[in-house]
Amino acid sequence: MRLTVLVGPGLVADAALLASSTAAACAELDVTGRVVTAGSAGEMRSLLAATEQPVVALPGPTPAARALIGAQPSGVVWYDLTVEPPVPGAVHLAGRGLWGLAWAIRHAVHRLRAPAGRIAYGPDPDQWGDLRLPSALDTGPAPVAVLLHGGFWRSIWGADLMDALAADLTRRGYASWNLEYRRPDRHGWDATTQDVEAGLVALRELARDRPLDLDRIVVLGHSAGGQLALRAAADLAGRTSGPRVALAVSLAGVLDLAEGERRYLGDGAVAAALGGSPATAPRRYAESDPMRRLPTRVPTLLVQGTEDSLDLVDANRRYAVAAAGAGDDVRHLEQPGDHFAVIDPASVIWQDTMTAVDARLGR
């Protein structure tokens, strides 16, 4: 497979750094890569039409080139280095800087290697999930792995962060449901939490004509998604109807919102997401802070890399003690690894995570 990074006219970036970043990301994925620069919007249009996928297109600032976003082949992944509003109907990532080019490349490759069905669970463009079903279902309906991405609840980060895990889980025999949700910086905190629950409830409809085992649902959330996973599991456990979570997995999760707000975690990400401090937004903290929701009565696996932020290591250790003290069934898996090792299918910590998940779900 050869991936093309197509650079639009006027893009503000060092060409050599674009080339080396592309080469590094492609090597990680075992694909070849190249960077092609278009001198005009017309040339970019022609190259898009003629270039075999996967393609990551960086449109740059010119209006004529930006007008191509979403108007060219549907498989193109568009990436803006700068923060830009989403373009409806396009596969469009934005705002992660040059470092984020690697994520756009990963997304383009995973979309081709492990195609998913994108299914809306609501009317907003951010209310969807990518569903992947395992190829072999000889033993009956598949357990369901629901994935919740992180990114400190900010809109520049999306469900593409969990593509690799979604593909890996499907290879392991799980149906993977990689959820996108409205983020609070654009829609408010309540929209975020409502979407996560709605995405889980949507599994009932999906299971009507698909082989999904709703008695074996595992919710895996990374970073900020770890908090969302634990809240959703606790919320559904208290409902009289709807799916129940058999196992909640926090992957380097943000598990103490009040203390995280006091420590200015993520440059103030907690207060920005919840709309204030525990003093000014008490309901939201009471409903959403994992420390405040104990006991959840949901089996929980905490996974944390020791080379991650010390504040996350600290919060996970304290949560494990508090959850056990409250009577919850909780396991704390702490091993070498950084913040992204826990969502890397090749890492030891992920292999051990799946050993624990399989055992809990009887696989």
For each feature predicted by the language model, list its residue ranges.
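Gly/Ser-rich "nucleophile elbow"/oxyanion-hole loop immediately N-terminal to the catalytic nucleophile
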Residues: A202-H222
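C-terminal catalytic histidine-bearing segment of alpha/beta-hydrolase fold enzymes
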Residues: R2-L6, A41-A50, V56, V313-A320, ...
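Gly/Ala-rich beta-loop-alpha elbow adjacent to hydrolase catalytic centers
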Residues: G221-G225, A229
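Hydrolase active-site cap/lid region
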Residues: L230-R283
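N-terminal cap/lid segment of alpha/beta-hydrolase-fold proteins
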Residues: S20-G39, Y79-T139
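Alpha/beta-hydrolase active-site loop
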Residues: G188-R208
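Short, surface-exposed "cap/lid" segments of acyl-processing enzymes
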Residues: V5-L17, S135-D168
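Short beta-strand/loop motif that positions the catalytic acidic residue
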Residues: T296-R297, L302-G305
